[in-house]
């Protein structure tokens, strides 16, 4: 035992001297390693596709000579950019200023590694490799002869704003041998399912073939087309998407004659959903938000007629419906700040046209939400509903209702004005937003930023038509802030008569 103890003690003493040598430890304490301080002018770097990136935004402090390593890649699936995890990382440069030309459009995680021989520091950036039409507002419009155009109001980067670069492009639709005619609706989709990515910017028309153009989301180049001619109708409005199975992802739409159709994002073909039990008056995204930081929004197709509301969440489940006997449906709104995706249905009594109520259902739709009340000393479950009476309702079935991810209120259109509605009370009696005199509201949209976006959805876009406006184009765009209904920007006389507006968010 004594021999073992002496050997162990000697080993400990030798290890202590070795550690002092390795880590510059002296009897008086540790020697401080040469630190590195990294400062950057911005946490976001923008560069155009095919243009060499020469980055001069670094300010680095180090007492010793330093080396650089730049690497980039997609953010790992299921994580946020703030977690700094890569799906796959590629080292691209050892130059202080990067000096690299990117060949792929998208938004990436960029990592800088700085080493001075004693210390290592990391700095992470958001890298946007831009195609020119990466993010902004797209407006589909038609002139008096049905000639269509796709106007794009670009969301400029700070660098582009400083340079005074062009923001409004009156028509970016350019397909060899094709003319855009009688445009009706727009939709943007981006989803990865079972390892397969489906994306596209869809343009629906009422031309002689009922053409649906499937454009590349990053460049607006034509990917493929589908024709509705053989169905005897055309796409009137898009609304909702989901995966049918592991090899199929589709966007849904209402045809002009009230049928439900599906456009396959992979095969580019159109098919009718034949189990729809009624002719559809309206269809829209049942867009919901999960509370998880990395969760995706889900945009199931919701649709309704005067009597029944329906939702389709999967091919196996089919169409689920609900109705209220003795009541007509006026309109439907979705509260998107809830993880439970509550659907609010506004009803009007068939027997008393001044009597209204709002009922609530989850995204399963098959049952109304309930609450427990004390009645005559007993606990009784009753449906959640919000009744009210009015002879002057400021809403009808033509009102377009929009929610967003940061407010429980929704916006909706009525009588050429825009109102707010809390969904749990009577709709507003006074407009929240009035457009300038002469402007006729054609469509509204929010800046929904995709299935994996943050909660920065804070804008309302309104497109209008003014037949008395001078100049070639009589269509305009007005941008309002959701929090206080304030007008933040206007772009007047930039398009023809608008049919649809949509926020074209950035897609990787």
Language-model features: where?
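Short, solvent-exposed loop/turn segments at conserved positions within beta-propeller repeat blades
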Residues: 143-147, 196-197, 206-209, 218, ...
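Bacterial N-terminal signal peptides that target proteins for export
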Residues: 1-10
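Acidic/polar, low-complexity intrinsically disordered N-terminal segments immediately downstream
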Residues: 4, 23-177, 452-457, 465-508
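Conserved blade-ending motifs and adjacent loop-strand segments that build the rim/top face
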Residues: 384-397, 429-453, 486-500
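Beta-strand initiation motifs
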Residues: 28-32, 81-82, 158-169, 219-225, ...
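Acidic, serine/threonine- and glycine-rich low-complexity intrinsically disordered segments
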Residues: 209-417, 422
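C-terminal motif of bacterial Sec signal peptides marking the signal peptidase cleavage site
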Residues: 18-21
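Entry beta-strands of beta-propeller and related beta-repeat scaffolds
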Residues: 133-139, 200-202, 251, 343-344, ...
